[in-house]
From Swiss-Prot:
Function field: Cell wall formation. Catalyzes the transfer of a GlcNAc subunit on undecaprenyl-pyrophosphoryl-MurNAc-pentapeptide (lipid intermediate I) to form undecaprenyl-pyrophosphoryl-MurNAc-(pentapeptide)GlcNAc (lipid intermediate II).
GO MF annotation: an example: UDP-N-acetyl-D-glucosamine:N-acetylmuramoyl-L-alanyl-D-glutamyl-meso-2,6-diaminopimelyl-D-alanyl-D-alanine-diphosphoundecaprenol 4-beta-N-acetylglucosaminlytransferase activity
Catalysis performed (reactions): di-trans,octa-cis-undecaprenyl diphospho-N-acetyl-alpha-D-muramoyl-L-alanyl-D-glutamyl-meso-2,6-diaminopimeloyl-D-alanyl-D-alanine + UDP-N-acetyl-alpha-D-glucosamine = di-trans,octa-cis-undecaprenyl diphospho-[N-acetyl-alpha-D-glucosaminyl-(1->4)]-N-acetyl-alpha-D-muramoyl-L-alanyl-D-glutamyl-meso-2,6-diaminopimeloyl-D-alanyl-D-alanine + UDP + H(+)
Topological type in the membrane: Peripheral membrane protein
Pfam family, one: Glyco_transf_28
Broad enzyme group: transferase
Top-rank lineage group of the source organism: Bacteria
GO cellular component: plasma membrane
Record carries keyword Cell membrane: yes
Keywords: Cell cycle, Cell division, Cell inner membrane, Cell membrane, Cell shape, Cell wall biogenesis/degradation, Glycosyltransferase, Membrane, Peptidoglycan synthesis, Transferase
Name of this protein: UDP-N-acetylglucosamine--N-acetylmuramyl-(pentapeptide) pyrophosphoryl-undecaprenol N-acetylglucosamine transferase
Chief location category: membrane
């Protein structure tokens, strides 16, 4: 006898911020005996190796933003092509439900599912609803949110909103109970600097100049791990080599980033939703530099969720100068109690079983079809 096992189509853009929580949900669904397929865009190749999907469908996608009318028009044409690809994939896969994690790459498959009357669930990772999710919210059965307070949810959709938290990937859960490292007077000071899955040039410009301004005794204790874009890597490494640091490691990408976060006394980073949620899960204090220029200022809102409880400092990029960063580092490293208190505060902001909560919601929705 053939036993029917439902399939859920998970839709996520090909960057870590969207893909990591989608991956966590996929593992939780598979634990429930639910099959998973992934719809994403062409950027996924470098980071989708561990995604537990029986099939990965690449959908044409583009973002219709910017001042160029031609570029926006071209993006709309690409999204239309992606819609055709997505509609064929949804018909072929016949999913019991489709889950979208935001970003324009999710629009074609989510919209195709809605038009084909397949139930859809949105997950909004940020503290401000993105434009793609806002567009899709009207047709979604459920809107799950990563943060308790989320701005921009359409008024007519608020009754369908459920706070699940942001799904935490297994690699983070594996180190989530790591105690905060000792910070006695002679212990190494472990600083981790990164800018999201694609790096951030501002970190390579500001952080080395700030480290140069630290007192020599702090520099001698400092063990620095920093993500740098490939084009910035050599210059960044060369600047640090002359500073007399206790240790330095720089690379374009760290596959073992959760473990490095757990080893750190302090993290300097952007404030994407995954970064903020993982800092809370592991319980590490941070200096957060929200990505500027976003129309909805989602990273600033994300950072505020930790800053408001004393778990992080949020510094706008316009104020993120070598002098400001050096002053904050000296203040924190010379007053270890501030760091330990911030670490404890961060822990209060996390929902460790968010993936299971979201999986239960998806399974319930799929079973109702």
């Amino acid at each position: 006898m053939t036993v029917f096992t439902p399939l859920v189509l998970v839709c996520a853009g090909g960057t870590g911020g969207h893909l990591f929580p989608a991956q966590s949900l996929a593992y939780a669904l598979k634990d429930r005996g639910i099959r998973v397929a992934l719809a994403t865009d062409a950027r996924v190749d470098s980071i989708a190796g561990d995604f537990p999907a029986e099939e990965i469908v690449t959908i044409a996608s583009a973002t219709p933003s910017g001042r160029s009318v031609l570029r926006r028009a071209g993006a709309v044409v690409t999204l239309g092509r992606g819609f055709g690809q997505a509609a064929r994939a949804v018909r072929r896969l016949n999913p019991a439900a489709v889950v979208g994690f935001g970003g324009y790459p999710t629009v074609p498959p989510m919209l195709a599912a809605q038009l084909l009357r397949v139930p859809t669930i949105l997950h909004e990772q940020n503290a401000v609803m993105g434009r793609a999710n806002g567009f899709l919210a009207k047709g979604a059965r459920v809107i799950a949110t990563g943060f308790k307070e989320v701005r921009g949810v359409p008024e007519k959709a608020t009754a369908r909103r459920v706070h699940t938290g942001n799904p935490i990937r297994p690699a983070v859960l594996a180190v989530a109970e790591t105690p905060y490292p000792s910070l006695d007077a002679e212990a190494p000071l472990r600083l981790l600097v990164f800018g999201g899955s694609q790096g951030a040039r501002v970190m390579s410009e500001v952080v080395p100049a700030a480290i140069e301004k630290l007192p020599q005794d702090l520099r001698a204790r400092l063990h620095l791990v920093q993500q740098a874009r490939p084009e910035d890597l050599t210059a960044t490494q060369n600047r640090y080599l002359a500073m007399g640091l206790g240790g330095i490691e720089a690379a374009p990408f760290f596959k073992d980033l959760p473990g490095r976060m757990a080893s750190a006394h302090l993290v300097v980073a952007r404030s994407g939703a995954s970064t903020v949620s993982e800092l809370a899960a592991i319980g590490r204090p941070a200096i957060l530099v929200p990505l500027p220029g976003a129309l909805d200022q989602d990273q600033a809102a994300n950072a505020a969720t930790l800053a408001q409880i004393g778990a992080a400092l949020s510094i706008p990029q316009s104020a993120f100068t070598p002098d400001r960063l050096a002053a904050e580092l000296v203040d924190l490293f010379e007053a270890p109690r501030k760091l330990t208190q911030a670490a404890a505060a961060a822990k209060t902001a996390c929902i460790l079983d968010a993936a299971d909560r979201l999986a239960a919601l998806v399974a319930e929705t799929a079973a109702a079809t």
